[in-house]
From Swiss-Prot:
Gene Ontology terms: biological process: ectoine biosynthetic process
Catalytic activity: (2S)-4-acetamido-2-aminobutanoate = L-ectoine + H2O
Entry-linked InterPro entries: Ectoine_synth, RmlC-like_jellyroll, RmlC_Cupin_sf
Origin superkingdom: Bacteria
Gene3D superfamilies: Jelly Rolls
Protein name stated in the entry: L-ectoine synthase
Enzyme class: lyase
Gene designation per UniProt: ectC
Listed EC numbers: 4.2.1.108
Amino acid sequence: MKVIKLEDLLGTEREVDDGNWVSRRFIMKDDNMGYSVNDTIIRAGTETHIWYQNHLETVYCIEGDGEIETLSDNKVYQLEPGVLYALDKNDEHMLRGGSKDMRMVCVFNPPLSGREVHDENGVYPADLD
């Protein structure tokens, strides 16, 4: 069994800061669970283009506020604590931080290796290993 404390991830290679967001990666590919789990902070007032062509992601908002816009149809959904969204079709989207930092629990399949950052198209590589 694994028990992981957030405080033990801070300042390590499992904490990845991309400017608009900081992701603390609890479970990764090398944990052999078949998925990865991140605790991610989306910074207030930011806008990030994301298009996970190689991953599916489910996201649950636990703090703060913001919005997500699906670029295929320009629908905008408000995000606040208690809202979950699933990018089940590799949906290209814009993620916007609101008036406060937004804290999200993110699950990826296939799992992240831990070093991923978005490329110029908002994509994580399929596999860094």
